[in-house]
Regions:
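Residue-level signature of catalytic and energy-coupling elements of molecular machines
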Residues: 3, 14, 47, 80, ...
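Walker A/P-loop phosphate-binding motif and the immediately C-terminal alpha-helix
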Residues: 5-39
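Short glycine/serine/threonine-rich phosphate/pyrophosphate-binding segments
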Residues: 18-23, 45-46, 122-130, 152-155
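Phosphate-binding loop that captures ATP/GTP phosphates
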Residues: 33-36, 40-85, 191
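Conserved nucleotide-binding/hydrolysis micro-motifs of P-loop NTPases
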Residues: 42-43, 85-87, 124-125, 148-152, ...
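Phosphate-binding/switch loop-helix module in NTP-utilizing enzymes
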Residues: 83-133
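Conserved Switch II/interswitch segment of TRAFAC-class P-loop GTPases
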Residues: 113-120, 126, 138-159
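C-terminal lobe/tail of nucleotide-utilizing enzymes
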Residues: 162-239
Length: 239
């Protein structure tokens, strides 16, 4: 069977919570499906940190004369990450061809087994990494993550344009850090001046996630509180 569908989680702007969205969405899918995460963010891999497996390393085996990685299994998710390859305290200074080759090898040398969905945590930007994913990893869909800041929205529109040119279907957009909740009154407080994101970006908003300290780290006990609706929206589109 192999991997049935690949979903890239992407944002042109860094710092909008793409990795956190990827982790939580994959966890929701893992309740009903076989799921993996490929952390392809070579400049700032975070999945091994979010899933609290920083001290772990994928087992390396030789299969058919080739080196293979056995992914880490955590919270019913199979994970392989550039974070297992790179030093946490050192910057990756790789040029485009090296970056592209590393992402391709990480996916191909990992023994994923039979997966319903493989989520790819993309690097921010619209450069070589995007082209590699499109041409080599061939995602079935991409899901964009943004905040409502003017700069993030502008860059999300650029990212949308690139994926359209690459002919990769875009599921929609997740509006992250959209609002806060007052601890005193429970009142929902928008973090930005309200804008019509669907009109600005031209894509369906599949969920609005709050800015809350509970989501700065992955917590499976509260994940469903924030992501179950988004999970159902995404699943309805891709199934």
């Amino acid at each position: 069977m192999g991997i049935k569908q690949i979903i890239a989680i992407a944002s042109a702007k860094g710092g909008v919570g793409k990795s956190t969205i990827c982790t939580n969405l994959a966890f929701q899918f893992s309740k009903d499906f076989n799921v993996g995460i490929l952390d392809a963010d070579i400049y700032g891999p975070n999945q091994h940190i979010l899933l609290d497996v920083s001290e772990s390393k994928p087992e390396v085996k030789i299969l058919d004369g080739k080196k293979s990685f056995i992914p880490i299994k955590v919270n019913n998710i199979l994970l392989n990450s550039m974070g297992f390859v790179l030093d946490d305290d050192k910057a990756a200074m790789w040029r485009g061809p090296m970056l592209s080759g590393a992402i391709k090898q990480l996916k191909e040398l990992t023994q994923w087994g039979d997966l319903d969905y493989l989520f790819i945590d993309m690097p921010p930007g619209t450069g070589d990494a995007y082209l590699t994913v499109a041409s080599e990893l061939k995602p079935n869909y991409v899901l964009l993550v943004t905040s409502q800041s003017k700069l993030a929205v502008k860059d999300t529109i650029k990212s949308k344009s690139m994926f359209e040119r690459l002919k990769i279907p875009i599921i929609g957009v997740i509006d992250n850090m959209s609002y806060s909740v007052s601890f005193q009154s429970g009142e929902v407080v928008p973090d930005f001046s309200p804008i019509d994101l669907e009109h600005e970006i031209g894509l369906k908003i599949l969920g609005s996630i709050p800015r809350t300290k509970e989501l700065t780290a992955f917590n499976p006990e509260i994940s469903s509180n924030f992501f179950e609706t988004t999970y159902n929206e995404v699943l309805q589109i891709i199934e």
